[in-house]
Amino acid sequence: MRLSPASLIVVATTCLMCLATSQADSLRYAPVMPLAPKSLLLDITEAGTRLVVAGERGHILYSDDDGQRWQQAMVPTTQMLTSVYFLNSQRGWAVGHDGLILVSDDSGENWRIQRDGLAVQYQTNLELREVAHRQLKNLQQRLEAADPEIRSQLEQDLEDAQMNLEDAEFALAEPTFTAPLMDVWFQDASRGWAVGAFGTLVTTVDGGQYWVNNEKVLANPDELHLNTITGDGKGRVFVAGEGGVMFRSLDGGRSWKTLEPFYEGSWFGAVYNAGNDTLFIFGLRGNLYRSNDFGTSWKAVFNDNTSTLAGGSASTGNPIVLAGGAGAVLFSTDGGQSFQLTLVEDRLGLSSGLGRDGKLILVGQGGIKVREVADHAY
């Protein structure tokens, strides 16, 4: 599913930029299904006062009445969508499997492809084959004129180059695969990032017209999965994922620092609460930490939950909501100083959620769930 480290160096060097060019007549749209609100849904966000959710089969749905009724959007894919994010009430992005990035300019009602990950990968495979072919030809020419003392090394290099070319040919002969994207976030109308499996990081500086493979800016030699990205909209950006890995930028993504890990398990989500300038990170076994200095130091947030936390939200003026396995929901009304635990009765796994007007709007297995919360909780 992922290119070899040596191939990644070549790809990073070329800094491949691509613009999706899929034509409308070749697109397969997500089917309109009456039970789509009950399908597996992985993320929820706000587009102004509108709620937008995304999940399996390319399903994106929106609601204008706090989750009571839902309409399906027109979405040109049937791939699993893992994350959805809106910069404002109109413009938003969704990402998912096969390295796909979608964009909407009408509050989530209609979507179009910005980045076709499979097309990107196929083009990359073509370029890798061309590079391998040139390297092989160059070594053959050098070997013909080589002095005896360096022939042995050149012969070994030639054998390696032949194997690289065979690998490149094999990649083109087989169906194209690429890593899924797991999260997306935009600092402003121009600059955005999407992160994913095997250390994938793609960036844009023009609102998504072009996306650039940019893994090389992070010190992630083991290609650990990157599961979550968030920021404050003022230049600070935070990325976290597998094995407790964390990265931070203080200059809008121009440079990145690896933060000292303090936990060996995986982080699945991070949310930023602008109200009190607090960053929260969470993951396996209910581990939850907060930082008041955007990742320089962390403090454990003790709670009654031991289920893995998968996602959540911290929108201005609403409770912080974190959701996870076995129907567990943590919510806070004091800016994250403390959290209350509630359990959804069916105990199915939850992927994310948000709070609004005395309600918890949750997504996960079994689709969308709206639950009332006692008045004193708000």
What annotation goes with each model-predicted range?
Residues 9-18:
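Bacterial N-terminal signal peptides
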Residues 22-378:
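Residue-level hotspots at or immediately adjacent to binding/recognition sites across diverse folds
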Residues 1-9:
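Bacterial N-terminal signal peptides that target proteins for export
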